[in-house]
Design a protein with these regions (language model features):
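Domain-level signature for proteins that mediate thiol-based redox and metal-cofactor handling
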Residues: 1-191
């Protein structure tokens, strides 16, 4: 029998939010899904997040595709906790432990509406990749056709990031209002 074990690599990337760090794997750990656990009490659906919250320096966990974004506790220093988190994540994934128990996929209500379809396409094509690159996620929540307001939810490193309001207003709102004339404003549930 040939042993085809692939080398697992985990490295850390800074995010625009100084309280979060993105830990990236060279393989997918949660393909096409995103799970956000901003507090320990919400982590029961993810054995990985639950295990990470056992560390006193972990204040939040966001898991998506090939990365885990950790929000540190006040007083924790990245240079002290980074090696611990990297070693833990590598061992956890190499042991093939479950990442999450969730398998439920929900669809966006009203996605058959042409304006909402345009908004979703722009989010998926232009905005989500940039936000994911920074260790976060943006999710469409709703579009009010009367007021022209798009509501989104920001997760991961975007939640609580000092620059997320600027990104939301100048970047996301600017792009959507230019590309979809019916959009007048973009607001976030979590800001």
């Amino acid at each position: 029998m040939t042993d085809k074990t692939e080398f697992l690599n985990v490295y850390a990337e800074q995010t625009p939010n100084p309280e979060t760090m993105k830990f990236v794997f060279n393989k997918m750990i949660l393909p096409d899904e995103a799970e956000d656990y901003p507090i320990k009490e919400k982590a029961n659906a993810s054995p990985l997040a639950k295990s990470l919250f056992e560390f006193s320096f972990v204040n939040g966990v966001f898991i998506m595709n090939n990365f885990v974004t950790i929000t540190r506790s006040v007083g924790s220093e990245w240079h002290e906790i980074m090696p611990i988190v990297k070693e833990f994540l590598k061992a956890y994934v190499e042991a093939d432990e479950p990442i999450t128990y969730k398998t439920d996929k929900s669809s966006v209500e009203g996605s058959d509406n042409i304006i909402i379809a345009q908004i979703l396409d722009i989010l998926d094509t232009y905005i989500k990749p940039a936000v994911e690159n920074d260790g976060g996620l943006i999710s469409f929540k709703s579009f009010n056709e009367v007021s022209g307001v798009v509501t989104v939810e920001l997760k991961g490193s975007c939640s609580g990031c000092p620059s997320s309001t600027v990104t939301l207003k100048r970047g996301i709102e600017g792009l959507l209002t230019r590309m979809v004339p019916q959009v007048k404003e973009v607001v976030a549930e979590s800001l």
